[in-house]
Amino acid sequence: MKNIKPLADRVLIKIKEAESKTISGLYIPENAKEKTNIGTVIAIGSNKEEITVKVGDTVLYEKYAGAAVKIENKEHLILKAKEIVAIIEE
């Protein structure tokens, strides 16, 4: 994997892929899937005082937050820590 280190109060998140099948078993084509706003924290910036999440946390972030980047053909976001609205506990 490319070594991307967010700066300051930014966080790198791997976006959770949208479901490819409905509950009833119908397949959803790639172009019809909705973008999720849930992801996993991959890396955090150096300003740890302002960052309340840690690597490995599953988080909910604002819908239009951050800058999209592709790493190894997977969608990721680099966003400010304040754009994360919740930690999802399993």
From Swiss-Prot:
UniProt entry tagged with the keyword NADP: no
Name of the molecule in the record: Co-chaperonin GroES
InterPro entries (alphabetical): Chaperonin_GroES, Chaperonin_GroES_sf, Chaprnonin_Cpn10_CS, GroES-like_sf
Predominant subcellular localization, coarse grouping: cytoplasm
Residues in coiled coil: none
BP term (GO), one: chaperone cofactor-dependent protein refolding
Subcellular location: Cytoplasm
Function statement: Together with the chaperonin GroEL, plays an essential role in assisting protein folding. The GroEL-GroES system forms a nano-cage that allows encapsulation of the non-native substrate proteins and provides a physical environment optimized to promote and accelerate protein folding. GroES binds to the apical surface of the GroEL ring, thereby capping the opening of the GroEL channel.
Keywords, in A-Z order: Chaperone, Cytoplasm
Cited SMART domains: Cpn10
GO molecular function: ATP binding; metal ion binding; protein folding chaperone; protein-folding chaperone binding; unfolded protein binding
Subunit and partners: Heptamer of 7 subunits arranged in a ring. Interacts with the chaperonin GroEL.
Record-stated family: Belongs to the GroES chaperonin family.
HAMAP family: CH10
Taxonomic path: Bacteria, Pseudomonadati, Spirochaetota, Spirochaetia, Spirochaetales
GO CC annotation: cytoplasm
Keyword Phosphoprotein assigned: no
